Swiss-Prot record:
This protein's record includes keyword Nucleotide-binding: no
Modification after translation: Predicted to be exported by the Tat system. The position of the signal peptide cleavage has not been experimentally proven.
Name of this chain's protein: Periplasmic nitrate reductase
CDD domains named among the record's database cross-references: MopB_CT_Nitrate-R-NapA-like, MopB_Nitrate-R-NapA-like
Domain of life: Bacteria
GO biological process: cellular respiration; Mo-molybdopterin cofactor biosynthetic process; nitrate assimilation
Protein species of origin: Shewanella denitrificans (strain OS217 / ATCC BAA-1090 / DSM 15013)
Length: 829
């Protein structure tokens, strides 16, 4: 042993001794070879939220063994949140699924049978048999898919192709419908193009930050560190936080405001009125770049048509309509929202409302507004987004460093996959929609499929899918990368009945047993994160790639492999109409795999193009560079149309690029001359998503929530996440450190509400609504401090399914669920 190895050995022995550990006599031999302890490090975006942190991933002997923040990342600059620290453990839970499982009795499929391990061949045989029979009997509208903002870009793209171009149905929707659909509709209505115009660089330039329904301290902690650094480094910077309850982000707030649920609409209109009444309108900007419209009102709440609340609405069928108005009409509309009436309605003191409005009105103050689920999970979520843009447009505080209305994404690729790829039931890639015949034609040409394959009618959105499953209209259903039986609303009445409907066949692809897999008929084991090559797109339009670093356990396969392999089971004769095939005989007898994935475009990149240093299971399975082919075909949709992506190989070299990427250069601020290559010289600003290049300011009122407390159900319920857990906890609750940090959900309640009900901290209670109930324990201290009359229950805990209690009301425009407001009562269990 040389001196260096001797010193290393003694260091290990000393450390072990200090920790009270005994090493075997020959332990020094274990470390004499550096090859045996060598770690391979590679970059990957974090698996969790929409921030898009980059992490360095260490592998050894075929396993991920460590992660740390990537110091070269512009997003997180070497930092990780508590979930990011434990990324190395999310794939190694003891109950990881490793083989397909089919409900069987006596060797045959039985909806009421026990889950039994089967081969992939048997799984796909059974699945295809059900799909074919359903399509033959009822047509393609009876099959559907529920996907995810956690799909990789090419997984989502392959799913869209399979459903819309293969099966000829638009019945595909992502779980991003629950989190970002209102943001999408807000962007499209105001700007005609989706996703934020600003970027994270705004955080180093802003003079004020305003959080609307966003607990960044827990939900976007790395971004919150940048906000905190700016606030503490620059004494003039102010932070305002608005929410229906107090949370950790309030710790930094100079201007904290707790408002009554749903009254954010009135507060937003008050700010617009204040700007106008105090002569703070940026007339040069408004005259050149803005139009005014009045939106349709009394639009309902997205409930079933026969629901008494829904039946009262007058304009549900025309919810997205609007009519032109002028500035004077808009001024008159918002004039009713004066500080006295809005303070009374919202519960926010007048002086705080005035101070908030002045932040926006003062031309010397650069303002960045952040919002997430408090705005989007709202029966008027689209309106909230539109009203937020109204304020920034009135004062011209937009598309410049520090001036940004910024919708923060929740999932790692809700932007990059759900939105940009177009995995929604009404969308196609690059902001195109199925209802536009020109858009359908473009997609059919790029996909090299016959005209008429893509239906013009949008498919069933997320909540509608559950209803249609229950009603027997949707009979074959494939769920990937989500846990909707825990995450969806009103699961007792509208979720579980559809999954267990005897007429339906439910397939769930997942890495772990979940509430949703328990309700399935067939479970497919899925590869996770760096067990496959992937790409995500984050909240600032940054696309990031990673290589496959380890093998998935057992027979687990990526969602991409599952989609492509399943497509081999169908020929065009089984899924396309006779009329289409007679008019296009060259497609007859071909498999959907041949039409969609071996079409001369997706399969044109050879295996030699892949980096030989990295494994790639999909390449091995299909014989070509699958991810590159899918990405380059997909990128065709956006190039030259304001959604430009760089070439595939560039992303593996970079730490992500913000689109549009033109001539190799990313775009930080969209719509501004000199920053955005799509803005014409001499215009200053151009909102080119609209034909006339002008953004829209909407006149939209305050309207009440779908369900409010009454004498029997006397409290508001709000649900949400906590720092330690990701969504339904199916990954994070299997990490011991994260589980121990927050093992069980609790009901956060104001001490006065507890006292009124004869309750004390730690008491077991029932949280009950008209739809269902759960048992939990009362928490009157800690991070979340609801006002009197409201309780907060996080939804990560599968043993406390709070979505038994929630209402399946949605925004009538975006179809996004309101998880923040329903009426409950809390009683001692």
């Amino acid at each position: 042993m040389n001196r260096r190895d001797f010193m290393k050995a003694n260091a290990v022995i000393a450390a072990a001794s200090a920790a009270g550990l005994a090493l075997p006599a020959g332990a020094s031999n274990l470390i004499t070879s550096s090859e045996q302890t060598k770690l391979e490090w590679n970059k990957a975006p974090c698996r969790f939220c929409g921030t898009g942190c980059s992490v360095m991933v260490a592998t050894r002997e075929g396993k991920v063994v460590a992660t740390h923040g990537d110091a070269n990342s512009e997003v997180n600059r070497g930092l990780s949140c508590i979930k990011g620290y434990f990324l190395s453990k999310i794939m190694y839970g003891r109950d990881r699924l490793t083989s397909p499982m089919l409900r069987m009795t006596d060797g045959k499929y039985d909806k009421h049978g026990e889950f039994t391990p089967v081969s992939w061949e048997k799984a796909f045989d059974t699945m295809a048999e059900r799909w074919k029979a359903t399509i033959k009997e009822k047509g393609p509208t009876a099959v559907g898919m529920f996907g995810s903002g956690q799909w990789t870009v090419w997984e989502g793209y392959a799913a869209v192709k399979l459903m819309k171009a293969g099966f000829g149905t638009n019945n595909i929707d992502p779980n991003a419908r629950h989190c970002m659909a209102s943001a999408v509709a807000g962007f499209m209505r105001t700007f005609g193009i989706d996703e934020p115009m600003g970027c994270y660089d705004d955080m180093e330039a802003a003079d004020a930050f305003v959080l609307w329904g966003s607990n960044m301290a827990e939900m976007h902690p790395i971004l919150w560190t940048r906000v905190t650094d700016r606030r503490l480094s620059a004494p003039h910077v102010k932070v305002a936080v608005l929410s229906t309850f107090e949370h950790r982000s309030f710790d930094l707030a100079d201007l904290p405001m707790v408002f009554h649920p749903q009254t954010d609409l009135a507060i937003l209109n008050f700010i617009a009125n204040y700007i106008i009444q105090n002569n703070k309108v940026n007339w040069d900007f408004v005259n050149k770049h803005v139009n005014f419209r009045k939106g349709t009102t009394d639009i309902g709440y997205g409930l079933r048509p026969a629901h008494p609340t829904q039946m009262k609405s007058k304009n549900a069928a025309t919810a997205n309509d609007s009519t032109p108005i002028d500035f004077e009409q808009f001024k008159k509309f918002v004039a009713d929202y004066d500080v006295e009436s809005v303070s009374k309605l919202s519960g926010v003191p007048e002086h705080k409302l005035l101070e908030l409005a002045e932040l926006y009105a003062d031309p010397k103050v650069k303002v960045t507004s952040f919002w997430t689920m408090g705005f989007n999970q709202h029966t008027r979520g689209v309106w909230c987004n539109n009203l937020m843009y109204n304020i920034h447009l009135l004062v011209g505080k937009i598309s410049t460093p520090g001036n940004s209305p910024f919708s923060l994404t929740g999932q790692p690729s809700a932007c990059g996959t759900a939105r940009e790829v177009g995995t929604f039931s009404h969308r196609l890639p690059a902001d195109m929609v199925v209802t536009d015949p020109k858009h359908r034609k473009i997609a059919e040409n790029i996909w090299k499929i016959p005209s008429g394959i893509i239906p013009e009618k949008p498919g069933y959105h997320a909540v509608e899918q559950s209803r249609r499953l229950k009603d027997g209209d949707l009979n074959c259903y494939w769920v990937q990368v989500n846990n909707n039986m825990q995450a969806g609303p009103n699961i007792n009445e509208e979720g579980l009945p559809g999954y267990r409907n005897p007429a339906n066949f439910i397939v769930v692809s997942d890495a772990y047993p979940t509430v949703t897999t328990q309700a399935a008929d067939l479970i497919l084991p899925t590869a996770m994160w760096v067990e496959k090559e992937g790409a995500y797109g984050n909240a600032e339009r940054r696309t990031q790639f990673w290589h496959q670093m380890v093998k998935a356990p057992g027979e687990s396969k990526s969602d991409l492999w599952q989609l492509m392999e399943f497509s081999k089971r169908f020929t065009t004769d089984e899924v396309w109409s006779k009329a289409v095939l007679d008019a296009n005989p060259k497609y007859k007898g071909k498999t959907l795999f041949e039409v969609l994935f071996k079409n001369g475009q997706v399969d044109k990149f050879p295996l030699a193009d892949a980096d030989p240093k990295y494994m790639n299971d999909e390449n091995d399975a299909f014989g070509f560079y699958v991810q590159k082919g899918l990405f380059e075909e997909y990128a065709t949709f956006g190039r030259g149309h304001g959604h430009d992506l760089a070439d595939f190989d560039t992303y593996h070299k970079e730490h992500g690029l913000r689109w549009p990427v033109v001539d190799g250069k990313e775009t930080k601020w969209r719509f501004r001359e000199g920053s955005d290559p799509y803005v014409k010289a001499g215009t200053g600003f151009e909102f080119y998503g609209k034909p006339d290049g002008r953004a829209v300011i909407f006149a939209l009122p305050y309207e009440p929530a779908a369900e409010a407390p009454d004498e029997e159900f006397d409290m508001w319920l709000s649900t949400g996440r906590v720092l330690e857990h990701w969504h339904s906890g199916s990954m994070t609750q299997r990490v011991p450190e994260l589980y121990k940090a927050f093992p069980d959900a609790v009901c956060f309640m104001h001490p006065d509400d507890a006292k009124k009900r004869g309750l004390r901290r730690g008491d077991e209670v029932k949280v009950m609504s008209r739809r269902g109930e759960i048992k939990t324990r009362i928490e009157t201290r800690g991070r979340n401090k609801p006002p009197v009359g409201l309780v907060f229950v996080p939804w990560f805990d599968a043993s406390q399914l709070i979505n038994k209690v929630t209402l399946d009301a949605t925004d009538p425009i975006s179809k996004q669920t309101d998880f923040k407001k329903c009426a409950v009562k809390v009683i001692k269990a």
